[in-house]
Amino acid sequence: MAIQVFNSLTRKKEPFVPLEEGKVKMYVCGPTVYNYIHIGNARPPIVYDMIRRYLKYRGYEVLFVSNFTDVDDKIIRVANELGEDVFAVANRFIEAYKQDTSALGVLEADHHPRVTETMSEIISFIRVLEEKGYAYEQGGDVYFRTRKFKEYGKLSAQSIDDLLSGARIEVDERKEDPLDFVLWKAAKEGEVSWDSPWGKGRPGWHIECSAMVKKYLGDTIDIHAGGQDLKFPHHENEIAQSECMTGKPMANYWLHNGFINLDNEKMSKSLGNVVLANEMIRQHSAEVLRFFMLSAHYRSPINFSDELLEGAKRGLERLQTAVSSLVHRLQESADFGGTEPWLERIDEFRGRFIEEMDDDFNSANGIAVLFDLAKEANRYLREEQTSKAVLQSFIDLFNELGGVLGVTLNRQEELLDEEIERLIEERNEARKAKNFQRADDIRDQLKAEGIILEDTPQGVRWKRGS
């Protein structure tokens, strides 16, 4: 059965059929780099990395492009506030973004284009729109004639006549129509600018992605993705620009991930209710944050709380402990016959995982299958005799499916001393709070990793087992 994808354009699930058999062209709108990312910003790279990994797992060759907006009003404002060069600010936050997303297990894009490196393509794109009558110049600014594109509003399901003037699009008396949006901004004194047929200036936000999609992926792509907040006006405007320029559909499938809310309100820098990703990585680990994100369906909103994050941490540790137990049992097991029923049962979990993930990349249900696999593994570990072949089959499947999600479940490498000390301290705190179940869980986790604890009057001592 084909993968089913919820297409924001048609507002329904559809079988995924790429333009070219076996190949997928995918574009994800990247960050405007003027600050460190918060966990809401971290969700798109994580979920679309998961989707990219799953498509590759299902045999597709994926060409993945994600951009950096490295010149923008916000970047200029921050640079002015700090008294720094615009490009220095952008470069600093690009590097910070790369560090955070790498820690979160996000694979490098095949192409990471920057606006400042795509200027000639952006200018050429606008020139074509102007020649076709879809764009006009006013005092060095260039605008898009929104009403001229008869399908405007098809992604966000809005009639052009129902759109409120200036509600989401900046009102400007130089526009022919209040709904027209800017393609090129005339230079302001002291701001960074580029030469163009309309004088010095810089591009508007929406045209940048249209130009980069065309440059790296062509006129029509398979998947265009981003946060739910980008659906209108950003993605709507991208469609208008690109389809008027090429005369072809921009993308066949549009994917949008849900928000992360804090106290039931969307997390956003403008609201000041953000939790920085690097802070969460330091406090809880990048792997826990990624697992937390993937424990919900990518289109569903997540109401963030420390309790939910702690639950994700316990869930991930349960899976890792199950795998560690399998790995340690391997050393004392032998090969013998009659294991086919177990091997067949293990293989069924692969089929279940694929079935869940084929349904619009449902990582939450995929993780539920992993928990069922862990239960089955623990049941097998209670057998009097355990077969190396069966144990290895369990381990291999955990590695395989964990890899699809970008989560390491087999922690065969030794825990670092600092991690051991942190877990022992957490166990001490749990015992003080009379949370003996958590204390026992930590002892079991350390035991599975070959760490032996000894409670003494002077405190807890530990050593690595042989």
UniProtKB/Swiss-Prot annotation:
ATP binds at K269. CDD domains: CysRS_core. The keyword Plastid does not apply. GO terms for biological process: cysteinyl-tRNA aminoacylation. Keywords: Aminoacyl-tRNA synthetase, ATP-binding, Cytoplasm, Ligase, Metal-binding, Nucleotide-binding, Phosphoprotein, Protein biosynthesis, Zinc. It is found in: Cytoplasm. Its EC number is 6.1.1.16. A motif ('HIGH' region) lies at residues 31-41. The keyword Nucleotide-binding applies. Binds 1 zinc ion per subunit. It catalyses: tRNA(Cys) + L-cysteine + ATP = L-cysteinyl-tRNA(Cys) + AMP + diphosphate. Its cofactor is Zn(2+). GO terms for cellular component: cytosol. A motif ('KMSKS' region) lies at residues 266-270. InterPro entries: Cys-tRNA-ligase (IPR015803), Cys-tRNA-synt_Ia_DALR (IPR015273), Cys-tRNA/MSH_ligase (IPR024909), CysS_C (IPR056411), Rossmann-like_a/b/a_fold (IPR014729), tRNA-synt_1_cat_dom (IPR032678), tRNAsynth_Ia_anticodon-bd (IPR009080). Zn(2+) binds at C29, C209, H234, E238. The modification Phosphoserine is found at S270. Belongs to the class-I aminoacyl-tRNA synthetase family. NCBIfam families: cysS. Monomer. PANTHER family: CYSTEINE--TRNA LIGASE, CYTOPLASMIC (PTHR10890:SF3), CYSTEINYL-TRNA SYNTHETASE (PTHR10890). HAMAP family: Cys_tRNA_synth. This is Cysteine--tRNA ligase. The lineage of its organism: Bacteria, Bacillati, Bacillota, Bacilli, Bacillales.
